Amino acid sequence: IKMIKKIYGKHIFYFTLFTVVLSATTLLTKNIFSFTNETITLFICLFLILSIGISHGALDNYKANKLLKIYSIKNKSIFFIIYIFISVLVIFVWSLYGTFTLLAFLLVASYHFGLEDTSFLHKGNSFLDQIFYLIKGSLIIFAPLFFHFDETLKIFETLMLSKAFLTFLEIEHWVINLCLFLSFIGYIYFAYKNKFDDFEVLFLDMLSILILNYIFSPIIAFTVYFCFLHSIRHIISL
C-alpha cells in the first residue's frame, strides 16, 4: 500500500509540475493556443482522449474478469452484451430526454471521478463516503462553469441541455459557486478521513484542476485532466 501511495504521490507531483509549466508557457506566450484553429484544437483533444483517455476504459475488460469471478460467471460474453446494451440504451434515452440524461451522466461522472481519484487514499464504503465521492468529483464539472461560464454552457447546449435549464444557470449563478465550494469541502473531508496523511496529494490534485480550468478552455482543461491524471491513475490502480 505504501508503495502504491508513493507512486500516486510522484504522479500527482509531476502532473502538477506539468500543469504549472504548461500554464506559465501559455500565459507568457499570450496563450499558445490562440493561433491554433479551433477545429485543430478539438481534433488534438479528441485524439488524446481516444488514444490515452479511452485506454483506461478499454481496461474495463480487466475489471470484468474480476466481476465475473465474484459472481462465478464463466461466460464472458454476458458482460459485453450487457455493456453494449447499456451504451446503446443511454444514447437512445439521450436522444429523447437530453436534459435528464445529461444531468444523470454528469452525476455519474462526478461520482466516478471522485471515487477513482480517491480510492488509493481511502477505502471507505459508508453512505456518507459515497456522497462525498460525488461532491469531490463534481469539481471537474463546476470548475469550468465557474471560470468559463459561457463557453461551458455552449458545450452543454450542444449536448442537448434544455434552454430552461441553461437560463436557470445564468440567473442562479450562486448555485455554481455553492457547488464549487462544496467540492472543496469534499477534499477536506477525505483529508480528514485519512488523518491528513498524504494531504499534499489531495491539495495538488485540487490545485492542478483549478489551474487548468482557469488558464485553459473547458475542452483543453478536461482533456489534460482526463488523459494525464485520471486515466493514468486508473491504469496504475489495476
Where is each model-derived feature located?
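Short aromatic-rich membrane-water interface segments that cap or initiate transmembrane helices
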Residues: S162-V175
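Hydrophobic, membrane-inserted alpha-helices
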Residues: L22-T25, I82-I91, F113, F203-L212
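Membrane-interface helix-loop-helix junctions at boundaries between adjacent transmembrane segments
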Residues: K69-I73, V88-F147, E157-A164
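Predominantly late transmembrane helices and immediately cytosolic-facing juxtamembrane segments
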Residues: E116, Y225-L238
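Alpha-helical transmembrane segments of multi-pass integral membrane proteins
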Residues: L107-Y111, E116, I131-T152, E172-F190, ...
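Membrane-interface helix-boundary motifs at transmembrane edges
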Residues: F35-T36, N65-N75, S119-Q130, Y189-F203
